[in-house]
From Swiss-Prot:
Biased composition (Basic residues): 34-43
Protein name: Twist-related protein 1
Alphabetized SMART domains for the sequence: HLH
Organism: Cebus capucinus (White-faced sapajou)
Cellular compartments per GO CC: nucleus
Localization in the cell: Nucleus
Transmembrane stretches, start-end: none
Lineage of source species: Eukaryota, Metazoa, Chordata, Craniata, Vertebrata
First-listed, main subcellular location of the protein, grouped into a coarse class: nucleus
General function of this protein: Acts as a transcriptional regulator. Inhibits myogenesis by sequestrating E proteins, inhibiting trans-activation by MEF2, and inhibiting DNA-binding by MYOD1 through physical interaction. This interaction probably involves the basic domains of both proteins. Also represses expression of pro-inflammatory cytokines such as TNFA and IL1B. Regulates cranial suture patterning and fusion. Activates transcription as a heterodimer with E proteins. Regulates gene expression differentially, depending on dimer composition.
């Protein structure tokens, strides 16, 4: 019987079955190795991705804990920078205020200069006008009781001119002037004063 088993030929179907059974066994280790490599590579990639993030997190959050002195220093530095910025802004605002303040005195000085010049011109005009009226009062015959304003002085000057015109047109004065070379200024002044008091100037002014 042993000889029959050993000597019995193996059928091709049995060979194919045995080969098919051996092939999965052979293929399993490589797949297991590849799976292990993939798992390792995925773990490495995950570890690498978490590593920088963890390092960054450790550098930011882990390294500077809320109660750590490093974070306190950084907080002070950031506060100092913020204060410096605000101080710089305040300085800029102060500079703007100084520039505007520098412009306002100049405009005030210009206005003050214009006012002074206007006052000087007004004084000169008033002085020249007073001098002209003083000269006119010397020519016009006035009474001792006269305290004439500028308008009254001008009206009196107009009346005196009218009186002189009437004197020149008078026939009686023409006959008197034929015998006299001239009529004294005092007489004209007296005649004009009488003429004023009698109100003859109002009658002549109405003509």
């Amino acid at each position: 019987m042993m000889q029959d088993v050993s000597s019995s030929p193996v059928s091709p179907a049995d060979d194919s079955l045995s080969n098919s059974e051996e092939e999965p066994d052979r293929q399993q280790p490589p797949s297991g190795k590849r799976g292990g490599r993939k798992r390792r590579s995925s773990r490495r990639s995950a570890g690498g991705g978490a590593g920088p993030g963890g390092a960054a997190g450790g550098g930011v959050g882990g390294g500077d804990e809320p109660g750590s002195p490093a974070q306190g220093k950084r907080g002070k530095k950031s506060a100092g920078c913020g204060g410096g910025g605000s101080a710089g802004g305040g300085g800029g605002g102060g500079g703007g205020g100084s520039s505007s303040g520098g412009g306002s005195p100049q405009s005030y000085e210009e206005l003050q200069t214009q006012r002074v010049m206007a006052n000087v011109r007004e004084r000169q005009r008033t002085q020249s006008l007073n001098e002209a009226f003083a000269a006119l009062r010397k020519i016009i015959p006035t009474l001792p009781s006269d305290k004439l304003s500028k308008i009254q002085t001008l009206k009196l000057a107009a009346r005196y001119i009218d009186f002189l015109y009437q004197v020149l047109q008078s026939d009686e004065l023409d006959s008197k002037m034929a015998s006299c070379s001239y009529v004294a200024h005092e007489r004209l002044s007296y005649a004009f004063s009488v003429w004023r008091m009698e109100g003859a100037w109002s009658m002549s002014a109405s003509h």
